[in-house]
Regions:
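Second-shell loop/turn segments in exported
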Residues: 1-4, 17-21, 30, 71, ...
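Acidic helix/loop microenvironments that form the catalytic cleft of cell-wall polysaccharide enzymes
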Residues: 35-38, 159-177, 243
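Extracellular/periplasmic catalytic domains that process cell-envelope and extracellular macromolecules
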Residues: 23-27, 101-104, 141, 162-164
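Low-complexity, Gly/Ser/Thr/Pro-rich intrinsically disordered linker/tail segments
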Residues: 170-214, 231-232
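Active-site-adjacent structural elements in enzyme catalytic domains
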Residues: 25-40
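Peptidoglycan-targeting cell-wall enzymes and recognition modules
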Residues: 1-8, 12, 36-148
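Short acidic, glycine/serine/threonine-rich helix-capping segments at coil-helix boundaries
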Residues: 211-243
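Solvent-exposed, polar/charged alpha-helical surfaces in well-ordered, non-transmembrane soluble domains
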Residues: 11, 15, 29-32, 144, ...
Length: 243
């Protein structure tokens, strides 16, 4: 319901899905539901790095410390933030190279880092190393980037068995938004003419996990996952897992 151009996305899916074995109601519904959640309802295809200085300290503090930089000058400066937090990782160059911003997260399942852009370009024969904006602006390329990740992680087998919980863990690293993913998966299955009840024999996988189960989080960690866990628990969300 939030998608800005549903007809355009349907056309792109009809073109791309058959080429990469997203070719059954179960696989199509799973892909649409998972990517829909990850992209805010098929609306957001470029990583939002518009963080306050406080949020930067909570979420990316270790990268600023590693770069010997104070977060305050980076307050609400997305390009500068990307160039610090993604520097010297994932085959990106240093802060001054601009690779962090150039290869920031894009697509329905955020393709991030020069190494991943290069691997995707090589495997799928599409030029995104020199033209990374294709991943967020060209619908077919955007879908291909998500399918590349999907197939690398063997997600069709979970789609075939209706194991949305494990699929979510492989994509998200935890179970954030599981209920929403399941809701849209059921909707998509219904629209594709598949009997949802056939996929509900094992109730365990549709159970919303407790906040303690969100991701692999340990004391001392500072991350987005910690922020989300704290919000789920109703406590101050400072991104710092500790007393």
């Amino acid at each position: 319901p939030n998608c800005k151009d549903p007809d355009g996305w349907v056309d792109a899916m009809n073109e791309v899905f058959p080429k990469y074995e997203i070719n059954t109601p179960e696989r199509i519904a799973s892909f649409i539901a998972q990517c829909g959640h990850e992209s805010g309802g098929w609306r957001v295809f470029s990583e939002n790095l518009n963080y306050s200085a406080k949020a930067l300290d909570a979420i990316f503090g270790k990268y600023f410390k590693r770069a010997a930089r104070d977060s305050e000058p980076y307050h609400r400066q997305p390009e500068k933030i990307a160039n610090v937090v993604y520097a010297n990782r994932m085959s990106n160059g240093d802060t001054d190279s601009g690779d962090g911003w150039k290869y920031r997260g894009r697509g329905p399942i955020q393709l991030t880092g020069k190494a991943n852009y290069s691997a995707f370009a090589s495997d799928m024969d599409v030029d995104v190393v020199d033209n990374p904006d294709k991943v967020s602006e060209d619908k077919e390329v955007a879908l291909m980037s998500a399918i590349w990740y999907w197939n690398k992680n063997g997600l069709n087998r979970y789609a075939d068995s209706g194991d949305i919980k494990t699929m979510t863990k492989r994509i998200n690293g935890g179970y954030i938004g599981l209920e929403d993913r399941i809701h849209h998966w059921k909707e998509a299955l219904h629209m594709l003419g598949s009997d949802v009840s056939e996929h509900e024999s094992d109730d365990e996988f549709v159970e919303e996990p407790s906040p303690e189960d969100i991701g692999v989080l340990r004391k001392g960690m500072k991350s987005v996952g910690v922020v989300m866990m704290q919000e789920a628990l109703g406590i101050t969300a400072d991104g710092d897992f500790g007393p």
